[in-house]
Amino acid sequence: MPRDGGPLPSQQKLQEVTASCKRKSWPTAWARGRAGPAMWLGVLQLLLLLLVDPPTTSTEDPAFPHLGDSSQPPPRACPWRCSCPRADTVDCAGLDLKVFPDNITKAVRHLSLQNNQLQELPYNKLSRLSGLQTLDLHSNLISSEGLPDEAFESLTQLEHFYVAHNKLTVAPQFLPRSLRVADLAANEVVEVFPLTFAEKPLLRSVYLHNNQLSNTGLPPNTFRGSEAITTLSLSSNQLSRLPPGLPASLEQLHLQDNLISKVPRGALSRQTQLRELYLQHNQLTDSGLDVTTFSKLHSLEYLDLSHNLLATVPAGLPRTLAVLHLGRNCIRQVDAARLRVARGLRYLLLQHNELGASGLPAGALQPLRSLHTLHLYGNRLQRVPPTMPRRLRALIMPHNRVAALGARDLASTRGLVELNLAYNHLASARVHPRAFRRLRTLRSLDLAGNQLSRLPAGLPTSLHELRLQHNHLRALEPEMLAGLDQLRELSLAHNQLRVGDIGPGTWHELQALQDQQAPYDKHLG
């Protein structure tokens, strides 16, 4: 059809022929009834020739898409309401689907069905998707009966399988060898089969946390032949001991929130690449660990044993350890010899234990030359631990029983940046005027919740934060705050200060508070 909407070429020619015929004599003869056979034949031949378009030179773009042009690919098939951003991707997430969608192309490589209400996956529909690499079924209502084991035999290219937050009670009996990531977290799984995760040479990450797995539900050969696994999460289950036969390739092992009371001898003897081990919130006792438990973990950097029943620091700690979390146990005394081997330790967390007056012997922490942060809050310590590492930057020990601060108690920690002695038993008479003199880099000092009746003398001029709320302060004079021109936050709430107890010009000393309008507290109680 012409682009201007005019008549077709053949129609135009027919009109011209008709007009020409009217100008010739033979139409007159026709009208008189004298047209012979020869004239009839000539007219018909002429009409046939003129109705056929002669070859012409087209001025149109040959690539212009015309109706019915077969050069354009047909539209891709995509399930109703889903999106198909690429030829190999089908995204049906969050559509409240109750049945497996129809019309999924066999060419699909990535299929997303998470956040729906699917209860089952039909075998005939799943098995035909043999090229599938990613199958995401996260957050549905799929039961073990609704997940056909046979279908996975056809999915020989599957690499990423996500079925977390469903209703599975057992893991699939078989998953393809091509698998790289398997996420079965937050189901009700009580049993894993030998070929669920075994014989998967490419498998790197397995997530089984928040299930109901006990040791009987994990066969000894669960991970046999899968020696590329680097991340294994078994947290929040019902395990009573470490599973045997863990892959030697592990780098992260999550076992927190179980019922583990014992780590069998040799259970961690092959995991020389393990960097992070999470065992918090279990039932570990001293007898459940021995000197060899952690001794072979030559790459271990992070060890969390908090919220257990330990009475001592574990033996055989690796030298590579950087973070040791022992909070909320029953530790009464720190064995210096056991800590000495972990010379690279940077963060030691001992909060909420039972450390008393002799809980930290003098020099017990001194070999930890790289120690950066020490958490001791919630114990029964009566003094600041003597002879601490020189590189210590943060000493956190609120809620203890410290009643005095001598002139040299903090002498070994000149590099402190944060000191928290809140909610102890400090009284002004027992805080030496030179107690803070050497702390020239201190930025945060928390003395809240003590029994101070006046500001301590000799506060470091480097301070940015000073917390003194919930004390017995009765006076505030300019000279007490002299030199604190970097102070940005001053908390004085819940003391015994009255308006007349604050000397003239007191706030003028605190230029940073005024210039930056920092949130200092002038509450006068």
For each predicted feature, which ranges?
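Terminal targeting and flexible regions in eukaryotic proteins, enriched
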Residues: 2-89, 93-94, 107, 117, ...
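Disulfide-rich extracellular modules and peptides
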Residues: 80, 84-86, 94, 144, ...
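Conserved LRR concave beta-strand detector
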Residues: 89, 110, 134-136, 157-160, ...
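Consensus "Asn ladder" position of solenoid repeat domains
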Residues: 95, 116, 140, 163-166, ...
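Leucine-rich repeat
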Residues: 98, 119, 143-145, 169, ...
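A structural signal for leucine-rich repeat
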Residues: 124-128, 148-154, 172-178, 194-200, ...
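A generic tandem-repeat structural signature
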Residues: 127-212, 219, 231
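Leucine-rich repeat domain C-terminal region
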Residues: 289, 355, 474, 488-525
